[in-house]
Amino acid sequence: RWMDHYDKILVERAFLSEPRLPATVLRLPMVFGEGDKQHRMFPYLKRMRDQRPANLLQDTMARWRGCRGYVGNMAEAIALCVVNPKAAGGIYHVAEAETFSERQWVERIGAVCGWKGKVIELPEAELPMNLQAGINAAQDLVLDSTKIRKELGYSETVPMEEAIDMAAVWELDNYPEKYDEGMFDYKAEDEVLARLSKA
């Protein structure tokens, strides 16, 4: 998988070791919002727009915490480093102050969109194949952005609720041109929901 070889440390070292280039390293989180080519909200939003009664999450993935940042706020952090001489030679982590679990993330998207469904956590073996995470979610991905806040005065201009709202509006108007329809096997999901209702 591409993510197994995804590492920018060597590039960071190359830039920071060049004395003639006053480089600054910014380590960004998962960036969401307008122009998100990975369409991070899409799997959840499509189900909400399709008025699905539930978003089913693998239990380990539901608890996983991953840092995020709204694209507008991340752009401000980048601009701050460009114009502030103090940033030269520095390494800064940038992320929202609070890191949500995947479940909390889906619930926040749902709240902003007025979705009346619920998030249901299930073990991997009880989920349809299209919803099995296929990753080890034991390790959270959390960034501490204290340094850029203290040294450069960074703070989010766009609050999280407003950011999610703007991102959701963009995502709903800009579905990916191509996507795997197998991601949305509603028949299999309905079978799981029917089984749960009988339990």
Segments predicted by a language model, with ranges:
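Active-site Tyr-X1-5-Lys
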Residues: 1-25, 40
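Structural element of the ATP-grasp superfamily
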Residues: 11-15, 48, 148
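Flexible, glycine-rich beta-alpha linker
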Residues: 21-45
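Conserved loop-to-helix N-cap of the C-terminal "lid" that shapes the substrate pocket in Rossmann-like
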Residues: 25, 65-75, 91, 99-103, ...
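Glycine-rich Rossmann NAD(P)(H)-binding loop
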Residues: 33, 57-64, 92-99, 136, ...
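A conserved pocket-lining segment of Rossmann-fold NAD(P)-dependent short-chain dehydrogenase/reductase
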Residues: 47-69, 77
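Mid/C-terminal beta-alpha module of Rossmann-like enzyme folds, strongest
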Residues: 77-140, 145, 178-199
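A contiguous, mid-protein "functional segment" used to position or interact
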Residues: 149-180
